[in-house]
Amino acid sequence: MSNGTIVQCIGAVVDIQFPRDQMPKIYEALTLADEGSSFAEQGLTFEVQQQLGDGVVRTIALGSSDGLRRGMPVSRTGAPISVPVGHGTLGRIMDVLGRPIDEAGPINADEKRAIHQHAPKFDELSPSVELLETGIKVIDLVCPFAKGGKVGLFGGAGVGKTVNMMELINNIAKQHSGLSVFAGVGERTREGNDFYHEMEESNVLDKVAMVFGQMNEPPGNRLRVALTGLTMAEKFRDEGRDILFFVDNIYRYTLAGTEVSALLGRMPSAVGYQPTLAEEMGVLQERITSTKTGSITSIQAVYVPADDLTDPSPATTFQHLDSTVVLSRDIAALGIYPAVDPLDSSSRQLDPQVVGEEHYQVARGVQQTLQRYKELRDIIAILGMDELSPEDKQAVARARKIQRFLSQPFHVAEVFTGSPGKYVPLAETIRGFKMIVEGECDALPEQAFYMVGTIDEAFEKAKKLQ
């Protein structure tokens, strides 16, 4: 295959000229030929995005474009970006191209797969109604997860998306004997480092493959790293395994597309996002699915810009998910963690035919009580509690207890809180909230419910408070 030469370089977008009859295909990987690349990154990879005609292709650089200049030689690989898959990736940290970044030697993988694959066909899909217990009360009660489902953790800056994600990894990945893939998309390097050490200390590192394209990396890396992680997860699924796939953060995937969209010559759409936002999200999300061979249970953190859930990026993500866990700044301000909003969060699994009649009625009872409290808040603020009817006073008292009982100490936050983390089985969660809703805990002070695990702990705490 003949070489091409760089003809234009604007940030991460590079135009490369090839002979007219040797134009590379869309998504083909190109590499910087070694000669003359003393200033630029050795072996820099480009991915073809557009064919401009006359032998010129427009590409995105998957790495820093510092030091590139016109006339540099670029060679074709004849194939899309391919990454190592299989058991050789477990316990390793890789970048967008599947290269190791943990300084632990080369990756021993028998197979490489292209990161661009078709989603499974409709007749291969396998919907699941089996519940996945998380041990986090508010999630198990109000927005239960399905095994093989897709979950989104929505929240603005600093309300606890990553801590919730880490607790879910702690509770599910450690209990779950299967394999996990973690894709760090445009997040802090420190969090990736913490995650690695957390897995190492828990002795589950040999069951996790990690792929990172962090905040400091060029947009090309952040745009493709989610696909790299997904390709590794798909390989395990196709072997008949049940996989956990964690993505932190899906918003940065969208943002990376926005950064290069204008440079690629596309007209921006609403709020400056790329016009292909829905398609890019669909291409990724449709591949994260369970087939008759194996399942992928995906948990994705979604940053909500300016706490606005109607922003095009989170709004586009909503339609692909089975469960949505919405983290609220108002609840975090009350000191209730996890700051999950039980009225905003929802799940397709919360159906009496799936979770059972008792679970459904308790969850709806909890939401009803909290909704009544929300409606009465303005009246209480203006007139005070004394003006309420006895029924409303009782509803408010129970709602405040429910609100506090929805809090829970996390294992991953032990170092900050000083209190040991609690894993609460689903049956205990239902029993506890049922007792509060039915009035069996009316005599207990509301402080007794704050930061405890089961309802029995609340009774013990109440005795100490008296």
Curated annotation (Swiss-Prot):
Compartments in which it is found: Cell inner membrane
PROSITE patterns, per database record: ATPASE_ALPHA_BETA (PS00152)
EC number, as in UniProt: 7.1.2.2
Residues reported to bind ATP: 155-162
Membrane topology per record: Peripheral membrane protein
InterPro entries tied to this protein: AAA+_ATPase (IPR003593), ATP-synt_VA_C (IPR055190), ATP_synth_F1_bsu (IPR005722), ATPase_a/bsu_AS (IPR020003), ATPase_alpha/beta_chains (IPR050053), ATPase_F1/V1/A1_a/bsu_N (IPR004100), ATPase_F1/V1/A1_a/bsu_N_sf (IPR036121), ATPase_F1/V1/A1_a/bsu_nucl-bd (IPR000194)
GO molecular function annotations of the record: ATP binding; ATP hydrolysis activity; proton-transporting ATP synthase activity, rotational mechanism
GO cellular component: plasma membrane; proton-transporting ATP synthase complex
Key words of the record: ATP synthesis, ATP-binding, Cell inner membrane, Cell membrane, CF(1), Hydrogen ion transport, Ion transport, Membrane, Nucleotide-binding, Translocase, Transport
Segments traversing the membrane: none
UniProt cross-references to Pfam families, sorted A to Z: ATP-synt_ab, ATP-synt_ab_N, ATP-synt_VA_C
Reactions listed under catalytic activity: ATP + H2O + 4 H(+)(in) = ADP + phosphate + 5 H(+)(out)
Family named by the database record: Belongs to the ATPase alpha/beta chains family.
Reported function: Produces ATP from ADP in the presence of a proton gradient across the membrane. The catalytic sites are hosted primarily by the beta subunits.
Subunit structure: F-type ATPases have 2 components, CF(1) - the catalytic core - and CF(0) - the membrane proton channel. CF(1) has five subunits: alpha(3), beta(3), gamma(1), delta(1), epsilon(1). CF(0) has three main subunits: a(1), b(2) and c(9-12). The alpha and beta chains form an alternating ring which encloses part of the gamma chain. CF(1) is attached to CF(0) by a central stalk formed by the gamma and epsilon chains, while a peripheral stalk is formed by the delta and b chains.
Protein name, UniProt field: ATP synthase subunit beta
UniProt organism field: Bordetella avium (strain 197N)
